[in-house]
Amino acid sequence: EGFKKRDYLYNYDNAIEKAQETKCIFLVEGQGDVWKLYEAGVKNAVGLFGKDISKKQRSLLLKSGVTKLIVLTDNDQAGRESKIKIKRDMSRLFKLVFPSMHTKDLGNMFIDKLKEEILDDLKGCF
């Protein structure tokens, strides 16, 4: 059977304390994106293991007690589709923030650019 990625959010157990403190979670597609945010000082990032959010992942987010999701999916077709689905499925449950990103993948950004272009506007969320 193997690992059921749809039942988990990558880094959830490590992110939950800071997420509950700030009432925010950074939602990204992959593990590399979580690592990049961690390098930049963000301790409350979780990864979807892809572009789609499952019912089980949504339940984990609801159970966390956060009120705001910072959605940073990739800047490609799949990432744009993911944003549309997240907006449709989650907008009644959370305040959603979709920071604009000028690169395809968060994991490829330099830390200083990530801080300047995205994180500077999100003080108090991490």
Residues covered by each model-derived region:
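Residues at the starts of beta-strands that form the adenosine-phosphate
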Residues: 44, 67-68, 93
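Short, aromatic/basic amphipathic alpha-helical patches
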Residues: 81-91
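Acidic beta-strand-to-loop metal/phosphate-binding motif
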Residues: 27, 64-78
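Short, acidic/turn-prone active-site loops that include or flank metal/cofactor-
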Residues: 48-54, 74-77, 100-101
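Phosphate-handling DNA/RNA-contact segment within nucleic-acid enzymes
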Residues: 1-64, 82-83
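Short, small/acidic-rich helices and loops at N termini and domain boundaries
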Residues: 17, 107-126
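A generic structural motif
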Residues: 95-103
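Switch/connector loops and helix/strand junctions flanking conserved nucleotide-binding motifs
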Residues: 79-81, 104-107
